[in-house]
Amino acid sequence: MAPKAEKKPASKAPAEKKPAAKKTSSSVDPSKKRTKARKETYSSYIYKVLKQTHPDTGISQKSMSILNSFVNDIFERIATESSKLAAYNKKSTISAREIQTAVRLILPGELAKHAVSEGTRAVTKYSSSTQA
């Protein structure tokens, strides 16, 4: 391996620093507080499903966080798999068929069957509501 070349000082003089442009006080209103960035979660939907199935049961913040992570993970897996399926078939659009196939590939046995039937039911319900 060749030895590294010796570093030589730069021949050019460093660029002159320009004075920073001053901000006018009218551009920033001090009375307005900066809003916190909103983090979107599935918490409200998880809670609604919980109340449909077990009306008298609550859920801790830690459990809600775990379920939210689970939903995000499954969503990402299905999206990735359906994207691959669309690419294999040389299509630029992910359709319901790609989603359904991805669900069948990712989820095991009976769980996949139930997920596909619920998904089909949801798509049918949505389609009928948009046509009316």
UniProtKB/Swiss-Prot annotation:
CDD domains: HFD_H2B. It holds the Pfam family Histone. Monoubiquitinated by the UBC2-BRE1 complex to form H2BK123ub1. H2BK123ub1 gives a specific tag for epigenetic transcriptional activation and is also prerequisite for H3K4me and H3K79me formation. H2BK123ub1 also modulates the formation of double-strand breaks during meiosis and is a prerequisite for DNA-damage checkpoint activation. Phosphorylated by STE20 to form H2BS10ph during progression through meiotic prophase. May be correlated with chromosome condensation. GO terms for molecular function: DNA binding; protein heterodimerization activity; structural constituent of chromatin. Residues 1-19 have a biased composition (Basic and acidic residues). GO terms for cellular component: nucleosome; nucleus. There is a cross-link at K7, K8, K17, K18 (Glycyl lysine isopeptide (Lys-Gly) (interchain with G-Cter in SUMO)). Core component of nucleosome. Nucleosomes wrap and compact DNA into chromatin, limiting DNA accessibility to the cellular machineries which require DNA as a template. Histones thereby play a central role in transcription regulation, DNA repair, DNA replication and chromosomal stability. DNA accessibility is regulated via a complex set of post-translational modifications of histones, also called histone code, and nucleosome remodeling. Belongs to the histone H2B family. This is Histone H2B.2. It comes from Kluyveromyces lactis (strain ATCC 8585 / CBS 2359 / DSM 70799 / NBRC 1267 / NRRL Y-1140 / WM37) (Yeast).
